[in-house]
Structures are given as structure tokens and as C-alpha cells.
Amino acid sequence: MNLNSLSEIASYIVSEGKGILAADESNPTCTKRFDSIGVESTEENRRDYRELLFRAEGMKGNIGGVILFDETIRQNAADGTSLVDVITSQGSLPGIKVDKGLQPIGDSEESLTQGLEGLDER
């Protein structure tokens, strides 16, 4: 895959027959999902769940890009392969959700998305 510009990357991700997999559930969201099926929300179980998604047969050729949660981009699969490498081996491009939620602005009803500050350190 030789994608040098933002336009080439965007075109690849949404090329014919491909979609985007939103695998960016936060840990609290993942916990709710696991609680509903009686599975403890440990880092290992979340990793196994994500690995199951990324290694699925239907991933190759159908998913152009995967949106990841902050924890996921640093995780390795059970065999030690980084989950990012698992995704790229399926022909998909990984990306990361950088926002960390909303914060109220002063006394108004408006809010601001957090997450860009401190991005380099993360």
C-alpha cells in the first residue's frame, strides 16, 4: 500500500465495497457491552474482543479503515503482534479517536471537545 497524500488515504478507505469499522468504544462503553453478556471487562478480554473483530474473515477486502480507541492502538494480540499490524495485514488503515469527551465552557450550555491538547505525549 503506497498512500502518500490525504486524498489517496481517504479514497482508499472508502473505495468501492469498503467501509469504516468504528472500533473506538471507550472502556466504560465496552464494560456495558460486556456486562450485558456476563463477561468481565478486563484489558485482556477487551483485547481478545478487538482481535476477534480485526482477524475476522470478512475484514479483508471490506473494511478500508478502522477507528481505534486510545487503549487499542497500544495493544498487542495474544500472539504478540500489535493490533495495528493485525489491521494493516488485513488491508485496512488504522486511525485513532483523539477526543476524550466534552467539557463545559464556562457557565454556558456550550461544550468543547477535549483531546487534542497533550496528543503528542499520548
Tell me the role of every PLM-derived stretch.
Residues 1-122:
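Alpha/beta catalytic barrel-like cores
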